[in-house]
Amino acid sequence: ESSETQVERLEPASVYIVPVRQHSGDAGTIVVKTGDYVRKGDPLTKSSGRRDLPVSAPTSGTIAKIGLHTAPHQSGLEDLEITITPDGKDEWRERHPIEDFRTRSPEDLLCIIHSAGIAGMGGAGFPADQKIAGAVGKTHILIINGSECEPYITCDDRLMRERAEEIVEGIRILKY
């Protein structure tokens, strides 16, 4: 049963096809070109407003193609996507972790969440910073919904078991 099986790390793919629009709203502006080298976390698109989110490289490698490809959506329609040929190193770009989130204002944290391209996991994929911003200063109760939407889906269950400390830290940030 999957609820008793630990989450496993997949082997790296031989190619990554990254949808430019992974959220509700418009696609961001593409900031790379074919032949560019990117590191994991490098921006592939730039946000032009609050309703679109930037998309980042999932690994290090070379931009092989920018063009239409069948979207990972039940419609089967084509959408703009960026193809990356990985170099096998999976190198991160330079990162600047925040040691103590309480040294930042809630507005700064919302900007960081937006810049990271974090979208909700629901079907609409709303930008997470927008969902959070609508509740700042107005909410006294935070409900963390860990229920799966189907009886045989267990990915959230496994993540809650295996990554509980990170989840609690995220809750602390949301409370802040």
Show where each model-derived region lies.
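Short histidine-centered loop motifs in beta-beta connectors
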Residues: 28-37, 41
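Cationic-aromatic interfacial patches
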Residues: 48
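Generic structural signal for buried aliphatic residues
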Residues: 38-44, 63-64
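Active-site-adjacent bridging/hinge elements
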Residues: 15, 35-38, 141-148
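Intrinsically disordered, low-complexity boundary segments flanking structured domains
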Residues: 2-7, 41, 68-71, 130
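Iron-sulfur-associated redox domains of electron-transfer enzymes in respiratory
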Residues: 52-176
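Generic hydrophobic-segment detector
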Residues: 15, 25, 31, 51, ...
